[in-house]
């Protein structure tokens, strides 16, 4: 076998494996999603935005806090987003303009997380329970939130 054939077959094997792993994780996610929760009030850590799994190894998880008077506050480690929200299960809508502090953040990962969070909060989201103390939010972007126990 020449080098081209070896690389070709390795590439095919890699793609086949990647597709199989993706399919099984999608079916698992679909089976664990249930109806919209009655309430989203409380503090939630953001564990995933779109396909990006967030880690708290170097920077803290972003946090979104929903208050019962329709106020929302979010922070990814530097700047704070705040505004109003309306939740009528399963639809979650944020006020047109969320306020954001404009501090210069020294960490690139925090800055990236803040940008992802602001983008994800810029649309109407459909909220579903996706496990014990977990919420899945889908709109223009996807977010996975886990209840923060204080």
Enumerate the predicted regions with their spans:
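Bacterial N-terminal signal peptides that target proteins for export
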Residues: 1-8
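Lipid interaction determinants
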Residues: 19-150
């Amino acid at each position: 076998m020449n080098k081209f054939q070896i690389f070709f077959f390795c590439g095919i094997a890699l793609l086949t494996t990647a597709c199989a792993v993706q399919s099984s994780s999608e079916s698992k996610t679909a089976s664990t999603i249930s109806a919209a929760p009655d309430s989203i009030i409380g503090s939630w850590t953001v564990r995933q935005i779109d396909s990006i799994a967030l880690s708290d190894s170097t920077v803290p998880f972003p946090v979104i806090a929903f208050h019962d008077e329709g106020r929302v506050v979010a922070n990814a480690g530097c700047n704070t987003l705040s505004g109003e929200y309306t939740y009528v299960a399963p639809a979650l809508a944020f006020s047109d303009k969320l306020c954001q502090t404009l501090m210069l953040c020294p960490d690139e990962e925090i800055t990236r997380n803040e940008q992802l969070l602001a983008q994800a909060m810029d649309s109407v989201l459909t909220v579903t329970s996706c496990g014990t103390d977990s919420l899945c939010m889908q709109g223009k972007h996807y977010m996975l939130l886990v209840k923060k126990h204080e």
